[in-house]
UniProtKB/Swiss-Prot annotation:
InterPro entries noted in UniProt: B30.2/SPRY, B30.2/SPRY_sf, Butyrophylin_SPRY, ConA-like_dom_sf, PRY, RDM_domain_RFPL, SPRY/PRY_RFPL, SPRY_dom
One Pfam assignment: PRY
Species per Swiss-Prot/TrEMBL record: Homo sapiens
Zinc is among the record's keywords: yes
GO CC field: cytoplasm
Zinc fingers (RING-type) by residue: 11-53
A GO molecular-function annotation: zinc ion binding
B30.2/SPRY domain location: 78-276
PANTHER family for the chain: E3 UBIQUITIN-PROTEIN LIGASE TRIM (PTHR24103)
Keywords: Metal-binding, Zinc, Zinc-finger
GO biological process annotation, one example: innate immune response
Protein name: Ret finger protein-like 4A-like protein 1
Length: 287
């Protein structure tokens, strides 16, 4: 999100903040000083847009006052935005010792012996059929359940191209095709094609996230009725769901699909950093 703001207020020519923004006839904006760097039309004094080659005469070039004001506001708020939209290291004291619940895992998910990693496979694992298992969607739940308190965990998505992580209600549908949306009890962020990120709101919310995102931090505060997602590598905020319902337990949720037949990417729950401090404040129900 912070990087998206920076792109909006940055001159595409000199890459400095657009404090003196001007706009060409086509809508292209740059700073006043960079007008001289634009190519002139062959037989006149008009300027050619760098992107669409539309010619702007002198009278077509206007100051972009609203953008100038936006730049000023963002620069003023930037220190506050950094403190609000970044991960608080103290969240880690609520880190949960979490594992995958094999009884809920789709049979085409290959889960490690320590129950902390999985990948998609071609062959069914021949686990017994039961109502709590996802029979079609490539999903698995985590344990423990959460009914109160604050809880934090990290998920390493590695090089996976298609994934979703977050929480879901205990009662979500697990049979047949499922729709990952807040209306159906799923509060998740996910990735498609390794570069398209979105949150499971209705309608879906596009997310501006670094393509190098490999580890997602998730902070669930049942008392405050919110769940927040962070990019652990740089601490940047990804998305927050607020006013979440608390009428039933929440379960950690994970989904993964191979991008191709050769894709051997793995999705993992990260180890607890300091179990002695991470487990004490957590209030949760065991399975």
């Amino acid at each position: 999100m912070a990087e998206h703001f920076k792109q909006i207020i940055r001159c595409p020519v000199c890459l400095k903040d657009l404090e003196e923004a001007v706009q060409l006839k086509c809508g292209y904006a740059c700073c006043l000083q960079c007008l001289n760097s634009l190519q002139k039309e062959p037989d006149g004094e008009g300027l050619l847009c760098r992107f669409c080659s539309v010619v702007s005469q002198k009278d077509d070039i206007k100051p972009k006052y609203k953008l100038r004001a936006l730049v000023s506001i963002i620069k003023e708020l930037e220190p506050k935005l950094k403190s609000v939209l970044t991960m608080n290291p103290r969240m880690r004291k609520f880190q949960v010792d979490m594992t995958f619940d094999v009884d809920t895992a789709n049979n085409y998910l290959i889960i490690s012996e320590d129950l902390r990693s999985f990948r998609s496979g071609d062959l069914s694992q021949n686990r017994k059929e039961q109502a709590e298992r996802f029979d079609t969607a490539l999903c698995v739940l985590g344990t423990p359940r959460f009914t109160s308190g604050r809880h934090y965990w990290e998920v390493d998505v590695g090089t996976s191209q298609v994934w979703d992580v977050g929480v879901c209600k205990e009662s979500v549908n697990r049979q047949g095709k499922i729709e990952l949306s807040s209306e159906h009890g799923f509060l998740t962020v996910g990735c498609r094609e390794g570069k398209v990120f979105a949150a499971s709101t209705v309608p879906m919310t596009p997310l501006w996230v670094s393509p190098q995102l490999h580890r997602v931090g998730i902070f669930l505060d049942v008392g405050m009725r919110s769940i927040a997602f962070y990019n652990v590598s740089d601490g940047c905020h990804i998305n927050t769901f607020i006013e979440i319902p608390v009428c039933e337990p929440w379960r950690p949720f994970f989904a993964h699909k191979r991008g191709s037949q050769d894709d051997q990417s793995i999705l993992s729950i990260c180890s607890v950093i300091n179990p002695s401090t991470a487990s004490a404040p957590v209030s949760s129900e065991g399975k």
